[in-house]
Amino acid sequence: MSAPTLSPNEFCILKLLWSANHALTRPEILEALPEQDWNPNSIHLILNNMIKKGVVEVEGVARCGRGYGRTYAPTISRTEYAAAQTMDTTSDMSGGERLLGVFAALVDMQGIDEKTTAELEQMLEQKRKELDAQ
């Protein structure tokens, strides 16, 4: 999966949708990001571009003032987006080389605790079983 290139405004909205944990209407987005000073027409264009890029979808409709408005939800998780960005950045490396390199860098930067180590071992064991079954 290739990570779509997002404008700063698109990424700002995507981060808001990730943190909201539910679909938001255009007025809710505007209200949650008052520092952006967007007008309603601008945000409509931004959301339509995000739909075209496949990072946002219209999930439904909700009451907005006297009428109804579409609700927008992300189609990609924060983790999936970060992984796709990383894969694009390291596209000159083989798959295994990328994974090991990124993992080693993250461990060096962030450190790793016993719980995380156990979860990683469990994930690797599950992957081994899947590969053995093939």
Language-model features, listed with the residues they occupy:
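Short alpha-helical segments that sit at the start of domains
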Residues: 1-16, 20, 77, 92-96, ...
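Amphipathic alpha-helical dimerization/coiled-coil segments
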Residues: 82-129
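Conserved RecA-like P-loop NTPase ATPase core
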Residues: 13, 50, 120
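Short acidic, hydrophobic short linear motifs in intrinsically disordered regions
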Residues: 23-32
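Short, cationic-aromatic polyanion-contact patches
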Residues: 5-9, 61-83
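Short, hydrophobic-biased segments on the C-terminal half of alpha helices
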Residues: 44-51
